[in-house]
């Protein structure tokens, strides 16, 4: 398995690698990736779920019960549900977001894809996303999967991160650069 040492070196990477290997053995990588996408969306939408995963004062038992309930509501696969139970038992739910990102990276690498994190000041339209995807695919020489997010603090423009490469075309960065240049 060709997984970068950087991913495996982190705690989140080790858990993600283990989950990927189990999913690959069972032939359910796509299902687990879909489960993790649902879970990632739920984490973004629910402050209560964030609190359950990040609050160290919540007991392991209560975290496990809450996560099991969430898994049932979201209709997650048995492997993903068991994985989340393991995270709760080991007090690692706070690293869930990092584990999801690491799993996506590993799965994409296995498919010969690369993920581009795209941050914009406003939601991008489908045609804008498709155009960006086409240009990034041509630039990278392999299939690019976009992971768009919105950050109003950018004011305008985009910040695209692919692996360790960053393309920052945000107005915020341009204004900061101009302000620093004016300081002398």
Curated annotation (Swiss-Prot):
It comes from the Bacteria. InterPro entries: ATP_synth_OSCP/delta_N_sf (IPR026015), ATPase_OSCP/dsu (IPR000711). Keywords: ATP synthesis, Cell inner membrane, Cell membrane, CF(1), Hydrogen ion transport, Ion transport, Membrane, Transport. The keyword Cell inner membrane applies. GO terms for cellular component: plasma membrane; proton-transporting ATP synthase complex. Its main location: membrane. Belongs to the ATPase delta chain family. HAMAP family: ATP_synth_delta_bact. This is ATP synthase subunit delta. The gene is atpH.
């Amino acid at each position: 398995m060709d997984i970068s040492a950087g991913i495996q070196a982190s705690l989140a990477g080790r858990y993600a690698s283990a989950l990927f290997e189990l999913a690959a053995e069972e032939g359910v990588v796509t299902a687990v990736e879909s489960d993790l996408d649902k879970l990632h969306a739920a984490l973004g939408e629910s402050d209560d779920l964030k609190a359950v995963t990040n609050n160290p004062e919540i007991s392991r038992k209560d975290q496990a019960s809450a996560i099991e309930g969430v898994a049932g509501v979201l209709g997650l696969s048995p492997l993903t549900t068991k994985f989340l139970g393991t995270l709760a038992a080991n007090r690692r739910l706070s690293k869930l977001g990092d584990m999801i990102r690491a799993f996506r990276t590993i799965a994409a690498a296995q498919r010969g894809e690369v993920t581009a994190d795209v941050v914009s000041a406003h939601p991008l339209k489908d045609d804008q996303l498709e155009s960006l995807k086409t240009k990034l695919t041509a630039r990278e020489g392999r299939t690019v999967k976009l992971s768009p997010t919105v950050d109003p603090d950018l004011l305008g423009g985009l910040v695209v991160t692919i692996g360790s490469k960053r393309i920052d075309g945000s107005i915020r960065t341009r204004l900061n650069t101009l302000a620093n240049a004016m300081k002398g």
